[in-house]
């Protein structure tokens, strides 16, 4: 993860690949000539979520549409997510304001708390505790790194009396750098993709091992499973 963030900083904070060019002043400081300061909703689509009625059991199921809440991420702290604790049914989806987010979308928890970030491994939807970003011009890696680097900035602009929330309008209006050549986004994505793939594979293996541990440990503790049987 440190390498992922270091690359983002090198490209879009320190501008190391562009040091030989001319720099100009902007509201975000010195930037390469030709680059512009835009909005987050110019490089990605900001999408909210929703919760089907909890009083309707038929709106929830074990194998339906993956549905994620901030609580799920508070447990897993996963960078990549395929599902939450419970899925919603087609009926639940039709009767709520949640929306399907395609693979590669970046999920950002916008309240309670602000700042959980995860990447969708498949089509997925969320509750209203998220303002997610579907990549358009920029790719998944750029948007993920951008949000990671702007959590404190987003928190400082969040509003609310009971608890702070980053609204959809706030997320859409976040300032973001737009290179004069948008292929720079693509080149950055190509560099980061291999790192992301390795991270996803490691997370999957760690999940498999922890699931195996949680299955075997109670059996060993109860005497239902003997250590000798594991060595055969």
What are these regions (language model features)?
Residues 1-7, 13, 18-51, 67, ...:
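Non-catalytic DNA-recognition/assembly elements of restriction-modification systems
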Residues 12, 16, 75-78:
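Proline-centered turn/helix-capping motifs that create local helix->coil transitions or kinks
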Residues 31-32, 36-179, 231:
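DNA target-recognition domains and sequence-specific DNA-contacting regions of bacterial/archaeal
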